[in-house]
A protein has these predicted regions:
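Alpha-helical cap/lid subdomain in secreted, periplasmic
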Residues: 3-161
Length: 161
């Protein structure tokens, strides 16, 4: 928040602010409960909305990992990730925000992840950047759209003639 306050002294507020969080803070290693993390995220969203009332907040989905750091229960942690994404998407859309999904990035696609199973591979990063760009372009050209891509919408690499 301090960085944004500083930038607002010399720049106009942005039209869009993309919020992309990694999964490192998903509970597991410090005993924090997922409800506590949701509360922190919600408080941050409220603060951003007050600070930037004319800026559209965009939630960029927390991506899955093949291996979560700290040796936590993978299935439980992934469920927390999905619930966090759903919670934030619902909260933002309700208040005029937007949501970007990454449907191609799935844990059962090992070629999309680096050998550590946490970070994206070059190909995974390309999918990520494509969907991020597509989402922003959609929200700029179609202001009433709230989610990108739509469920079932294929990327151009999956379209066949």
């Amino acid at each position: 928040m301090p960085k944004i306050k500083c930038l607002l002294k010399v720049e106009d507020p942005p039209n869009f602010l993309v919020l992309h969080c990694g999964g490192n803070n998903i509970p597991g290693d410090k005993g924090e409960k997922s409800v506590d993390l949701r509360l922190k995220i919600n408080n941050t969203l409220v603060s951003f909305a007050k600070l930037l009332p004319d800026t559209v907040l965009v939630w960029s989905q927390i991506l899955p990992c093949q291996h979560w750091r700290g040796g936590v229960d993978h299935e439980a942690t992934d469920m927390v990730r999905k619930r966090l994404n759903s919670f934030v998407a619902t909260a933002l859309i309700r208040t005029g925000g937007k949501y970007i999904r990454y449907p191609e990035i799935q844990i059962d696609c090992p070629h999309l992840f680096a050998p550590d199973g946490v970070h994206l591979s070059e190909l995974g990063n390309q999918f990520f950047l494509y969907r991020l760009q597509q989402g922003l372009q959609t929200f700029i050209t179609k202001p009433t759209e709230k989610v990108s891509p739509k469920l079932g919408e294929l990327g151009p690499w999956l379209c066949y003639d």
